[in-house]
């Protein structure tokens, strides 16, 4: 027996990464998992090295970031890799979620995989927000103020919770210090959840574009799919390098190169681009408490898909109606992201409210109705044949 199979530790690696049977029909959309793993490794490693030179004291936070950029050897590379790595992490994550929605990866027997994935998504957004605040530029300060103030919408105890989060009566030194501590911790929790995600996936194996269940047409992971993953890894590194070396600030906000000033409010307070769709949902609801609930519901609504999707066929590969509404949903999500960076004025307020309604309607109304209609059509087609 090969040593990789007999050794108690290497046998785990072997069963997950080498001899793991994969469907022979999976396409390049299944490579996003390996890209997300690469992004997580980049974020953790660059974050650890940056933390060696970063000071979480509010008087020194902004200056310490500039110190990393100017004085630390290759500090500029660490900072730009970390900042752009977050953007690429979310690009891959949104594409990974879209792949799951299109191919029905949330369907039984992979419900646990989907639930753990949604938890990872929530924690990744939290880590991104906490890291954005640590820079303590102008947008970081006001972003932290706005987002933490959302907890004041909780009846009776909201304001007390906000002051507890701040460690005072405004965003101050304790706020940045505890945000940095949490920002350092959360990625390791995400890494643990990624292992759980991987373990849950290993129980039933990967799904496939055809949406069929079967263990007959499978081939080993190593050799075929490892090489296939490497192709997209190199393509990813090319695009990642283009941003890091040639356009490192394109995905950032220029106001964050101004030190945080609580006395000067920016013309518009916006989070990083990857949080804009949910920020647009928050702003589309006039009531503060309902807006906060709606924003969190926009993330957690992903968990209802295993219940609302009643289709007898997994995925949208053979379903014309589902394809149409899926791409309509993607367009609507991109529209929400665009609205999130615009000023709150007509007609963007109404557009945001309509887009928010369509976002929730897709999960709660459209998916169950369309899946039921397609079930009837499948039944009619099968009877006629």
Swiss-Prot record:
What GO molecular function annotations does the UniProt record carry, in alphabetical order?
A: metal ion binding; ubiquinol-cytochrome-c reductase activity
How this chain assembles, per its entry, is: Fungal cytochrome b-c1 complex contains 10 subunits; 3 respiratory subunits, 2 core proteins and 5 low-molecular weight proteins. Cytochrome b-c1 complex is a homodimer.
Where, per UniProt, does this protein localize?
A: Mitochondrion inner membrane
Query: Is this entry keyworded Transferase?
Result: no
One GO cellular component assignment for this chain's record is: mitochondrial inner membrane
Q: Where does a ubiquinone bind?
A: 202
Q: Which keywords fit this entry according to its UniProt record?
A: Electron transport, Heme, Iron, Membrane, Metal-binding, Mitochondrion, Mitochondrion inner membrane, Respiratory chain, Transmembrane, Transmembrane helix, Transport, Ubiquinone
Bilayer-crossing residues are 32-52, 76-98, 113-133, 179-199, 225-245, 289-309, 321-341, 348-368
Q: Which Pfam families match?
A: Cytochrom_B_C, Cytochrome_B
An additional note in the Swiss-Prot or TrEMBL entry is: Heme 1 (or BL or b562) is low-potential and absorbs at about 562 nm, and heme 2 (or BH or b566) is high-potential and absorbs at about 566 nm.
Q: According to the entry, what is the taxonomic lineage of the organism?
A: Eukaryota, Fungi, Dikarya, Ascomycota, Saccharomycotina
Native source organism of the sequence: Candida glabrata (strain ATCC 2001 / BCRC 20586 / JCM 3761 / NBRC 0622 / NRRL Y-65 / CBS 138) (Yeast)
- Cite the binding residues for heme b b566: 96, 197
Query: Could you identify this protein by its name?
Result: Cytochrome b
PANTHER family in UniProt: CYTOCHROME B
Q: Which family does it belong to?
A: Belongs to the cytochrome b family.
Identify which cofactors the protein needs according to its UniProt entry. Answer: heme b
* A biological process from GO: mitochondrial electron transport, ubiquinol to cytochrome c
State where heme b b562 binds: 82, 183
The free-text function statement in the UniProt record for this protein reads: Component of the ubiquinol-cytochrome c reductase complex (complex III or cytochrome b-c1 complex) that is part of the mitochondrial respiratory chain. The b-c1 complex mediates electron transfer from ubiquinol to cytochrome c. Contributes to the generation of a proton gradient across the mitochondrial membrane that is then used for ATP synthesis.
């Amino acid at each position: 027996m090969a040593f990789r199979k007999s050794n108690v530790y290497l046998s785990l690696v072997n069963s997950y990464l080498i001899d793991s049977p994969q469907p022979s029909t999976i396409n390049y959309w299944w490579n996003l998992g390996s890209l997300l793993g690469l992004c997580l490794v980049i974020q953790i490693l660059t974050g650890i090295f940056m933390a060696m030179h970063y000071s979480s004291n509010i008087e020194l936070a902004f200056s310490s970031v500039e110190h990393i950029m100017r004085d630390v050897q290759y500090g500029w590379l660490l900072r730009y890799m970390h900042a752009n790595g977050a953007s690429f992490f979310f690009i891959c994550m949104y594409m990974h979620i879209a792949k799951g929605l299109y191919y029905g990866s949330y369907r039984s027997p992979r419900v646990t995989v989907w639930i753990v994935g949604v938890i990872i998504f929530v924690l990744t957004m939290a880590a991104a927000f906490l890291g954005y605040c640590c820079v303590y530029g102008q947008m970081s300060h006001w972003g932290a103020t706005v987002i933490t103030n959302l907890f004041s919408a909780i009846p009776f105890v909201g304001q007390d919770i906000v002051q507890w989060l701040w460690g005072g009566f405004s965003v101050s030194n304790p706020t940045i210090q505890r945000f940095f501590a949490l920002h350092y911790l959360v990625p390791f929790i995400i890494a643990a959840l990624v292992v759980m995600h991987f373990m849950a996936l290993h129980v039933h194996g990967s799904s496939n574009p055809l949406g069929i269940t079967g263990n007959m047409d499978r081939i080993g992971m190593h050799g075929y799919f490892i090489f296939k993953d490497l192709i997209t890894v190199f393509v990813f590194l090319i695009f990642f390098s283009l941003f890091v070396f040639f356009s490192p600030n394109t995905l950032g906000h220029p106001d964050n190169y101004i030190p945080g000033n609580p006395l000067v409010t920016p013309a518009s307070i916006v989070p990083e681009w990857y949080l804009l769709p949910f920020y647009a949902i928050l702003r589309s609801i006039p009531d503060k408490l309902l807006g906060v609930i709606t924003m969190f519901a926009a993330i957690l609504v992903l968990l209802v898909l295993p219940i609302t999707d009643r289709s007898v066929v997994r995925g949208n590969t053979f379903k014309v109606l589902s394809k149409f509404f899926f791409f309509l949903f993607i367009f609507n999500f991109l529209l929400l992201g665009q609205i999130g960076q615009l000023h709150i004025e007509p007609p963007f307020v109404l557009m945001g409210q309509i887009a928010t309604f369509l976002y929730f309607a897709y999960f709660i109304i459209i998916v169950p109705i369309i899946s039921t209609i397609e079930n009837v059509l499948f039944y009619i087609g099968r009877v006629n044949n």
